[in-house]
């Protein structure tokens, strides 16, 4: 089994999840919602072969965490995967759409370099 959308950093006990994934022979891509979470998640899954970690900046969090874009760029060279990026045009986040676009563009440019 492969799970391509798991926020391991949001589980209360991520270590137990890593053990279960390993024991059951599953594969998991842990998609982080912020660059800071990427660092912590990488530490939690160190040594677990079947779990990979994607560097992300969730569009829902861009308004409050856009200052982490510089950290995103710093970490990008060490990240094998990028995930949980994009745009959220829902009514709740519509006012942040211009900022989301700017941050997404910065991420895409950084990924292309």
Q: Which sequence ranges carry the predicted segments?
A:
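Mid-domain alpha/beta scaffold segments of enzyme catalytic cores
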Residues: 1-113
